[in-house]
A protein has these predicted regions:
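N-terminal export leaders
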Residues: 14-20
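Short, charged N-terminal beta->alpha structural module
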Residues: 49-73
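Extracellular ligand-binding/catalytic regions of CAZymes and related secreted enzymes
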Residues: 46, 123, 229-263
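C-terminal region of N-terminal signal peptides and the immediate post-cleavage residues
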Residues: 33-45
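N-terminal secretory signal peptides
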Residues: 1-14, 25-32
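A short, well-structured beta->alpha microelement
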Residues: 75-91
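Catalytic beta-strand/loop cores that center a nucleophilic Ser/Cys/Thr
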Residues: 168-233
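A glycine-rich, often tryptophan-bearing local segment used as a flexible ligand/cofactor-contacting loop or short
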Residues: 106-178
């Protein structure tokens, strides 16, 4: 969430003063040109709106914002939601290519009370080509009851479910199979997903019991990407909870999900 006309040479010998002035004007012109190109480049980068309402965790929105800015597309990021100074509205969505509902919080009904008024507009925006990215808590909200109802199926609590290796809502590190490879990711009470038969879905990762953990689905002309785990978690998340990741702390999985969702 991520713009000189050549001079005709003088035939008389230039003085030191004219050389200095000319050099100063040229430098100023180049600086102005560079600043203009930087502004233009920033405007050309796609805009991502990241929800950062009061129910979210302190690090959730800033963490995914950093990953978005560092992505190959170099998203510009704007925070939206209560307390940010920018409301999530149809007009705000119209300026953006990607909307991110990060993780954090446990008050699903409380967050939904903030989001329900925009639900119809958000669904229409995705239907017409926008992209929704939901991470953990935001992945639950991509489902229904309550939620935006963007999935060809639904989200459910995977921790404690039959076949789950995580019995409760603890912070932990789990293995997933991501595009055929075993990878380890940060996990805290994220959802798994059910998928309707014949749905247009790309399952990027599954939990150890085969349940879809990360997927991207079509929704009209748009895309919906959801992750139960936190592929965007950086080293600080692990350190804070006394955890480590044997794979390291690369953002390659998060970038894979972003690229698949926001194409």
């Amino acid at each position: 969430m991520t713009s000189d006309t050549p001079r005709t040479p003088h035939r008389s010998r230039p003085t030191r003063r004219t050389l200095l002035l000319g050099g100063g004007f040229a430098a100023t012109g180049l600086l102005a040109l560079g600043a203009g190109l930087a502004v233009a480049g920033a405007k050309e980068r796609p805009l991502a709106l990241v929800y950062d309402g009061p129910q979210g965790c302190d690090d959730c929105a800033p963490t995914i914002a950093t990953v978005l800015k560092d992505s190959p597309r170099g998203y510009r990021v704007e925070y939206v939601g209560p307390g940010t100074g920018t409301a999530l509205t149809a007009a705000a969505l119209a300026r953006a290519e990607l909307y991110v509902q990060p993780g954090g919080g446990s008050d699903l009904d409380g967050v939904w009370s903030d989001l329900e008024p925009i639900a119809d507009d958000l669904r229409e925006w995705v239907q017409n080509g926008g992209s929704y990215l939901g991470l953990c808590f935001g992945a639950y909200l991509a489902g229904s009851e309550p939620g935006f109802d963007l999935l060809p199926g639904d989200a459910f609590g995977w921790a404690g479910s039959e076949g789950s290796t995580v019995p409760d809502d603890r912070d932990t590190v789990i293995p997933v199979t991501w595009r055929g490879d075993t990878r380890h990711v940060y996990f805290q009470d994220g959802p798994g997903f059910t998928i309707d038969d014949s749905a247009d879905v790309d399952v990027l990762a599954t939990y150890s019991d085969g349940t879809p953990a990360v997927l991207v689905a079509a929704y009209g002309k748009g895309r919906v990407g959801v992750a139960g785990p936190h592929p965007e978690a950086d080293r600080s998340w692990y350190t804070e909870k006394g955890l480590s990741n044997s794979d390291g702390y690369s953002m390659d999985l998060a970038q894979d999900l972003i690229a698949a969702t926001g194409r």
